[in-house]
Every structure is written in C-alpha cells, then in structure tokens.
Design a protein with these regions (language model features):
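Hydrophobic helix-and-loop "lid/oligomerization" segment in the mid-to-C-terminal part
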Residues: 2, 9-140, 160-161, 211-435, ...
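Acidic-glycine-rich active-site phosphate/pyrophosphate-binding loop
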Residues: 75, 171-184, 516-521
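Mid-to-C-terminal polyanion-binding domains and interfaces
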Residues: 75-81, 312-316, 322-357, 409-575
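Short alpha-helices
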Residues: 99, 175-216, 221-233
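Generic beta-sheet signal
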Residues: 114, 144, 167-169, 183-185, ...
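Short gly/pro/ser/thr-enriched loop/turn and capping motifs at secondary-structure boundaries
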Residues: 119-121, 150, 170-175, 189-191, ...
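Intrinsically disordered, low-complexity regulatory tails of plant transcription factors
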Residues: 150-151, 235
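A short acidic, amphipathic alpha-helical/loop segment
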Residues: 152-156, 369
Length: 575
C-alpha cells in the first residue's frame, strides 16, 4: 500500500490508433496500445515483433573492428598459435567464454579458457591472467564481457607479445586499450546499429562474423543461442531489437534441445517439466551459474557449460547448486547485518543514498546486499568490503537514476570502477570511503529527480476481469520474452471484492491466495499476492479495493490463468 501508482490514460489520438491497429491485427485494443508504446504501428511490424526471425540479425561486419578481429583470429589459427578465451566470472562472462570456446573448439584444438578469481585477481583482465597466458605460450587472447578499461594490463600483454581482441559491452573510458581489435557498440566511434548487446551477445556476433568469413553455415551457431539467452536475461539488458531476436530463439533452443550443461542446471532447478522463461533464468538458472564465481571460481561454471557428458554435468550442477545454497545463507546474514547498520545512521531520513562498509563481509555477495538495500530503502546503495587492502564493492540504483555517472563523478577517489546505469563495481583506498560517501551523496542529491525517490508502479492499462479472455491471454503471451524495454504489462482493476475464500498461505504465512470478484462485470478471478499477508485484514472487511497485477499461468493448474498481485489499495469510491 506504500507504493505510488502511475497511470497515464491514453489520449484520444492514442485510442484511435489502437483501435485502428486492433482492426488490422485482430488483437485487443488494450494490447494494441502496448504495441504502439513499443514502436509497433502496423500488422507487418506486429508480425515481426511476435515472430522474430534470425535472418533479421544485423550484419556482424557492421561492428567497428570486426574485420580486423576475424583476420587476426584466422591468422592465429593459420599459424597454429595458442588462443586463450578470457572472461568475467559472472553469468554474462562465463556464458560468453563457454560460447566462444565451444564454437572454436569444433575447428581448432590449440585453445584454452580462463576466468579470473574474484578474490585474488578482481574484475577484468589481471596481470596474473596475462602471466598465465604468457607462461602457457598464448599469442592471442579473446576477452569477453570485460577488458574495455584494461589499458595497463593489455599494454603489459603487448610487451610480452600477446595480442588482444576485446568483446565488451561496458561503457569505455576516453582512452581505449591497445588491443588489435575492440568490438564494443558503445565505443565513441561505433558503427553498429544496436548498442545493447550483452557481453555474450558480442561474442556471438564475433563467431557469426568468423563463420561468414569461413563459409560455415549459420545453423552451426544456433545451438549456442541458449547461452546468449541466459546472458541477456541475467545481465538485465534490453530485450528489444537484436536482443529480442537472440533471446526469442535462445529460449526456443533451451526448451527444445539445450546444451548438456544447461540441461543439468535445469534439472537441478526442478524445471525439467516446464517451459523455461526469462523469469526462470533470472531467478533460478542465472543465480546458480553466478554462485560459482561468488563462492568459489567462475571457471567451474564454464566447465559445466562446456561439458558433453550429462552424468558429469549433473555432478557439476549439483556442486554449483551447493554454492548457491551457501550464497543464500550469506545473503540472509549479511542483509540482516547491513539493515542494522543502515537503521543506526543518524541522518537516514534525510539522505538520498546509502554507503556502508564492513571489512568482514563476503565479497561475492555484496552486490546482492546492495540490491536488497535499494529495494528496502529505495535509494542508490553502495556496499563495500575489504579486499587486498582496498575497499571494494558494488553499487545498485533505483529506476531512472544513472548510478554509473554518480560513481564516475567520484573517479579521482577510486582505484577502479565500471558498470552500467543501474549496477556498478568500484574499489578505493579505505581512507577515501568517508569522502566518497560525502561526494556520492552530494551528487545524487543534486541530480536525482523527485519521482525517482519513491517506489512507483507504472500501470499499462485499466481493464475489467471480463477483458481477460483466453484469446487476450494468448495474445499477451506473444509479447514474450519480457525484460527491460519490453516489461511484463501491469494492469489495474478498480473496485474488486474478496469472494469469500481468500486466505493466507505459505510456509511462513507470508502470501495471500485470493478469489476476487470484479464489481463492474461480476467476473471472478483467482490471484496470488506474494509477501503481502498484512493486507488480508483489509481484504476481509468486505470493502472494495483496487489491484494492480500481471497475468500469469497458474503453475499448479496448467491452462488456468491467475493474477499475480503487485499491490492493493482501498478504492477511492465510497463503499
């Protein structure tokens, strides 16, 4: 009940356009309004949106340096040089390494992969990693999901006779590393028409270009799309444009013929009998892959993702699942400790940010804790721990606010930083934490907008229960895969009542199972409100209330639709 609801009724012009598109497509005007908001204004565009085609992927050679990268890779193979595939320890990095390694290994055997240890080497290209490459005779490193800021490390590698091809999607600094080729659609002189690829997505485009250059049929790349889909979903990049095509077909691959490693993870997650969605990747598959790098070493995730024997893969997946259980325990403990620290801040009510530092916290979980604090207190949060004599941590942000720019403003206090709009990593000398806290707070206070300081639920449409027909739900499902820039629509219905059977459920009695009647149409719908058991007293008063919700398939009763309640508020009308 504390959330602000934001709904902008459609203008007369928008309503007319939605009706016209509905007439052309046969789709509900409510859903046509959502299509128009996504830039889709004709039946032909709707068809391309609902059925993305792999033939619509951009030419990979439109990316700057792609021709150079392919030539250098071909040269390395021709000379029989040792190649090292190097990547970050998160989901995007490990899937990227697995993808490039698996594909190239079909044509070339003198190849290895490397994932830096989060605790010994930190994020990105490390001197230790370069030394490993040199000692093992590597002449070419393909670095994925990192490297765009590794100016010193790549210069060091160059001195040792090692070339780099960078495949990254992070924002670069003014000075680019001295790599042979830099594949990054965010570089200032970028020529590629889509800038939101994941790190694994950039790796896929590199392999696509390599395949084209060497006469390899595209169908040999399609089995790798499952890894791209996992990376896109887990890295929370926009799922429109080229990412929508890649994710749509990646999910088809996951649900028809996933790689052995992914099949093992799906089995361990208990998802073998259901259709895998972006949500399953974000909340179940991705966290398990991530747990390897958080708790142990990301290399174990790559070992699983490239494994060919299912029984061996299942053993590895179970081990990674254990890491995830450890991660959850650490998450719970550290979040509780962090909450206590935050609640003791004297000026908490006046602050726009949270910055906390605990030398004993586990480095692999601080990003999750930062996310929890952002959710609880709804403000940008930075959580720091001590690693190798530095205060190292993660930042998370609220909707609409660019935390990367806020951190960049304090760059003179930092040893290293990088990331995106809503998530970033950083490190600094411990003596700089106090000044960083002050400057970070100052920047955010001066730049955050009033509407970004409280949780807002953006409502896409107001509907009645009678609008939720089987055809409506089937058309809504065609908007999948959902994600940033194509979020799952949130609907609102006014003046609903408890039908009499709503009750609190859950192991800790934290959820509400609802049966609701719409006062306007008298239609009845089932729903579930997760974590909202405190609302049940109001619901049982027999007074009307408004709900906002997404429409889901009931996982316990296949074919039955239910409402997943996001929030509940008393109706404004008198009862």
């Amino acid at each position: 009940m504390n959330n602000k609801w934001n709904y902008q009724p459609p203008s007369q012009e928008q309503t007319e356009k939605a009706k016209a598109l509905a007439k052309e497509t046969g789709i509900s005007p409510v859903l046509c309004k959502l299509l128009l908001e996504r830039g889709i204004s004709s039946a032909a565009e709707a068809k391309r949106f609902f059925r993305p085609q792999l033939m619509e992927l951009h030419d990979p050679f439109l990316m700057k340096d792609m021709d150079i990268a392919v030539d250098r890779l071909n040269e390395a193979m021709g000379r029989k040089e040792r190649i090292l595939v190097y990547g970050d320890y998160d989901v995007d990095g490990t899937t990227a390494v697995a993808l490039v390694y698996k594909f190239l290994q079909q044509f070339y055997s003198n190849i290895d992969y490397y994932i830096p240890n989060r605790y010994e080497e930190g994020y990105g290209v490390s001197v230790k990693g370069v030394d490993y490459a040199y000692e093992t005779g590597v002449k070419l490193i393909i670095v994925l999901d990192c490297g765009i800021k590794a100016v010193k490390e790549i210069a060091y590698a160059k001195e040792k006779g090692i070339d780099f091809i960078i495949c990254d999607h992070h924002v670069p600094d003014d000075v680019l590393p001295p790599a042979v080729a830099i594949l990054n659609a965010k570089r200032p002189d970028a020529t590629y028409p889509y800038e939101h690829l994941s790190g694994c997505g950039v790796g896929f485009k590199f392999m696509q270009a390599f395949a084209i250059n060497n006469g390899i049929e595209f169908h040999q790349l399609t089995p790798l799309l499952d890894l791209v889909a996992v990376s896109v979903a887990s890295d929370i990049v926009p799922i429109m444009g080229e990412n929508r095509i890649l994710t749509y077909h990646g999910l088809k691959q996951i649900n028809s013929n996933p790689s052995v490693g992914l099949r093992a993870i799906i089995d361990v997650c208990g998802l073998s009998d259901k259709e895998i969605t972006v949500g399953d990747i974000v909340f179940k598959i991705g966290p398990r892959i991530n747990a390897s790098g958080r708790i142990q070493n990301g290399k174990e995730a790559v070992e699983l993702l490239v494994e060919k024997d299912f029984s061996t893969a299942l053993e590895k997946a179970n081990q990674i699942n254990q890491y995830n259980e450890t991660r959850k325990d650490l998450d719970k403990t550290m979040t509780e400790e962090a909450n206590k620290i935050v609640e003791q801040l004297e000026d908490l009510s006046e602050r726009r940010t949270i910055v906390i530092f605990n030398e004993e916290w586990h480095k692999g979980v601080i990003g999750i804790v930062a996310s929890r604090l952002t959710e609880i207190y709804y403000r940008p949060a930075v959580v720091l721990t001590r690693t190798n004599d530095l205060a190292t941590g993660s930042a998370r942000s609220v909707s609409g606010f660019d935390v990367y720019k806020a951190i960049e403003h304090c760059r003179d206090l930092l040893e290293n930083f990088g990331g995106h709009t809503y998530a970033a990593g950083l490190s600094m000398k411990a003596e700089n934490v106090e000044e960083f806290t002050r400057r970070f707070e100052e920047y955010v206070t001066n730049h955050i907008l009033p509407e970004q300081t409280s949780a807002v639920i953006d409502i896409d449409a107001e509907i009645d229960f009678r609008d939720i027909t089987p055809r409506f739900y089937q058309d809504l499902k065609r908007f999948n895969p959902f994600g940033p820039d194509n979020h799952k629509p949130i609907f609102c219905t006014h003046n609903v009542y408890d039908y009499g059977t709503s009750k609190v459920v859950g192991r800790e009695q934290e959820h509400i199972k609802l049966e609701l009647v719409d006062n306007k149409s008298n239609n009845v719908m089932n729903g579930i409100a997760f974590g909202q058991s405190s609302q049940v007293r109001y619901i049982k008063t027999k007074r009307s209330f408004d709900i906002c919700y997404t429409i889901e398939e009931n996982t316990h009763k296949r074919g039955e639709v239910q409402l997943q309640i996001e929030d509940i508020k008393p109706s404004e009308e008198l009862n």
